[in-house]
Structures are given as C-alpha cells and as structure tokens.
Regions:
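N-terminal accessory segment detector
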Residues: 1-113, 120-138, 148-173, 179-185
Length: 185
C-alpha cells in the first residue's frame, strides 16, 4: 500500500528536522530548481533552436521573477515601495542567492550594484569547453521586473552580462537606481 501524505504531514516533517537538515534541503531544492530550468531550456533549444529558447526563457523569467519577488515580500512582510534597501533584502532571499556567490557594491539610498561573482550555469559551460551563454536579454527582464515589483521607482541597467565582455572575476553586474527626484526625504 502506498502511503498518503497531506501538506500538513510534510509541514510537520519539516518542523521535525534540525537546522542543518533544513539548510541542506533549501540548498538542494534550489539546485533542483535550476537543474529543471536548464533542462527545460535545452528541450526548447533542441526543438526550436537557440533564439526561440532564449526568447521563451526571457518571457518565462519576466513572469517568474514577479511571482518570486511578491512571495519574498509577503514572507518578509514588505509592501512595494521600500526603495533600494528593500530590494537588497529581497535579493538575499532569491533562489539564485542560494547558489551563486554575489557581491553588493556602491550601496546608497538611491543606488546599488549587484555583481554575480560566480554563476553555476556559466561555470558548467566553461568546464565543458562551451562559450558563455548569452543571457543578457533574459537577465535584463529578470532583474528589471524583480526590482520593479519591489519598488516601481527602481530602474535597472545591465553593466555587463554575456554576450558582453566581462571581468574574469564576475559573470554579470546590474545597477539599480532610483532617480533623485523620486527618492523620499
């Protein structure tokens, strides 16, 4: 007989675990999510080509990132409009933040720069001798919509992202700004 599990059973199971086990599950779930994203992309690419796969990926990320931002904000008890500080807090809670080393630079009330120090996708391609994956259009949709969901005043600019040239110690970098005339006093 196959056991049945309710959502409550699963929640109770998670509460029974110690902190280290929970952290391992969170990291492993993030890896599984990214593996699914990559396999999905490869399936679309195999059937429809790279350009179509990138466009489908861009559209999917544009939508997913809004869902992700809203859920993070709800979990943190945030409302839209919290500025750069709210964005930086939300970025720490993204699935990607559990997998890719990142750095925040030049943080102020009106500006921050996020640098992706390592990227599991790009590093895997490099290990396989493949060229950088040209993810700039996807990243721009992803980061712009995430930031705009956190605070509609935030504007996003890509500093560098493949296929752009980038320093060896980073894969991509994104600038988030709130125009000075829209900053709260």
């Amino acid at each position: 007989m196959t056991p049945n599990y309710t959502l409550q059973d699963i929640v109770e199971f998670l509460y029974s675990l110690d902190r280290d086990d929970l952290v391992r599950i969170v990291i492993d779930d993030a890896k599984n999510w990214l593996a699914h994203d990559g396999l999905w992309f490869q399936a679309v690419e195999a059937q429809h080509g790279m350009a179509a796969a990138i466009e489908a990926d861009r559209v999917a990320w544009e939508r997913f990132t809004v869902v992700e931002a809203r859920r993070i904000m709800e979990r943190l008890g945030m409302k839209p409009g919290g500025g750069i500080a709210a964005l930086l807090e939300c970025l720490k809670h993204r699935l990607y933040a559990r997998l890719n080393p990142q750095e925040l630079r030049e943080v102020s009330e009106g500006r921050a720069v996020l640098v992706m120090r390592d990227c599991r996708v790009q590093s895997a391609r490099k290990r396989k001798g493949l060229p950088d994956f040209p993810c700039k259009s996807v990243g721009l949709a992803e980061y712009a919509e995430f930031a705009r969901t956190v605070d509609p005043r935030i504007q996003t600019r890509c500093i560098a992202c493949p296929p752009d040239d980038h320093p060896r110690d980073q894969w991509c970098a994104w600038e988030f700004t709130i125009p000075s005339d829209e900053q709260r006093s």
